Amino acid sequence: YMLAIGMAGATSIRVGKAVGMQNVKNTQVSGFVGLIVAAFLTLPFTFFAVFYPETIARIFFIDIEIINLTAQVLIIIGCLAVFDGMMAVTLGALRGTGDVWMPCVMQSIAFWLIGLPIAYYLSVNLEYGIIGLWYGLGSGIFISLLLLVPRFYMISSKPIVRL
């Protein structure tokens, strides 16, 4: 995730520079290249978390029950890592365009109004426990990404004029 955060900062700078130059094409290219790079940067973690979760868990724990639960959670986290990294970079790209308030609203909707209730329902009502919490968080991440990427595309499709 830290690589994706670094990529978000770099993407924000590149997008901001393109916006300042009134270059629509470079604004979009900078944002979408950042998304692709973030996805590729998170793939190694995803690979190990999905295919070797028990090995990773054994590095930190001895108790077999904790290892098994951690392995289950690592698979979910591994699958979410790509989307989480892409979400972070999309936020950076939007920051570079100067759009900060609407992404905040979108994040609030995705996590507080969608992700949290799903997490609660799965973890408490259906008794999925920590797995349900991660499914809820994952739904927030995924919904957020589905809201933010079209927002960036819409904003970056025309010159951005700041007063």
Residues covered by each model-derived region:
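Membrane-interface helix-loop junctions in multi-pass transport and translocation proteins
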Residues: 53, 59, 67-68, 111-145, ...
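Small-residue-rich hydrophobic transmembrane alpha-helices
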Residues: 1-53, 84-103
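Residue-level recognition of transmembrane alpha-helices
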Residues: 38, 74-77, 81, 107-108, ...
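Hydrophobic alpha-helical segments of multi-pass membrane transport proteins
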Residues: 76-90, 140-155
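Cytoplasmic juxtamembrane regions at transmembrane-helix boundaries
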Residues: 100-112
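Transmembrane helix-loop junction
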Residues: 5, 17, 58-59, 72, ...
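Alpha-helical transmembrane segments of multi-pass membrane proteins
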Residues: 4, 64-87, 109
